[in-house]
């Protein structure tokens, strides 16, 4: 609806202000999205809602944002320009639908039909807002199931990590030590000059090997610039 799109634009502008303020001053306001009852108990807001905005109380080394809009670029907003390292974590679309249907029916009490309607209602935003961000990211981790997910609307189980591969794509492969990564991650291989494929169960290891030195470099560069 026009109203929901308007609220979405307001949220993105708030997020852009947060990124801009942190890049200029090293501080900004932040909030959490509540996914479940555990987070409700921790942060005091109902699942499906955001907590109130808060301001950083102490100096920090970096800002970590986890959400759906961290690399949005359109005619009015450019979030991607403020992020030093943009990471995309996304399953192939059928797996994404399976995960959403199971999560919303099992944990939130929705019917499959209601979740399907939500997916269809959000398709325009998915195509025009979500997908383009993965072109802006520096590294993408895409989970690909190796079992049949051809009809996600009737899938009885979510494919496990052992039933999946993960494709890791680097926007700029220069300086990436692919032979080292392949040697450290068992059963991995390069599928393109900028991509490596790993077993689904090795995702955590791959993230540690790839991201730890990159984040350490960002922190060191920031400290030297002060």
Task: Give the ranges of each region predicted by the language model.
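Conserved phosphate-donor/acceptor-positioning beta-strand/loop module used by diverse small-molecule
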Residues: 66-67, 79-104
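Single conserved hydrophobic/aromatic residue that forms the stacking wall/gate
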Residues: 1-7, 11
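Glycine-rich phosphate-binding loop used to anchor ATP phosphates in small-molecule kinases
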Residues: 13-81, 121-133, 148
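C-terminal accessory "lid"/substrate-recognition subdomains
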Residues: 50-58, 62, 93-226
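Glycine-centered secondary-structure boundary/capping sites
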Residues: 6, 25, 108-109
